[in-house]
Amino acid sequence: MYRPTTTSYSPVYTGNPLYDISASQSDPRQRIRKNVRFQTEVDEFPDFDDSDSDELQFENRDPRKRIDPIKHMLLVQRLKRVSTSSRRLFIFTLSMFLIAFILLIAFVSFRD
């Protein structure tokens, strides 16, 4: 395999991908940066732990998996509405049972 000498390289490129600096972002020889999230792969172990994480459990760092804040806000508002209506229905049902129980006690006591 033919390998050009270092003098034939542009001064920007050393031939070592760890130290090459690309002339443009789209250059395929773009410098490989170490310890940059989403650019280097994380070492995964069989139990989904990763080597460079301080946490015990592997955390998926993919930004596409993050929750959309607007969807989350709308979901929380909907849950609040549902919980409020459920609470009102529960209180109404409980009060109806209490009134029926009081009427039953009154009916039984007046019958004697």
UniProtKB/Swiss-Prot annotation:
Chain positions found as Phosphoserine: S51, S53
UniProt feature coiled coil, ranges: none
Membrane topology label: Single-pass membrane protein
Predominant place of localization: Golgi
Domain of life per record: Eukaryota
Transmembrane segments: 90-110
Subcellular compartments: Golgi apparatus membrane; Endoplasmic reticulum membrane
Protein name: Uncharacterized protein C1795.12c
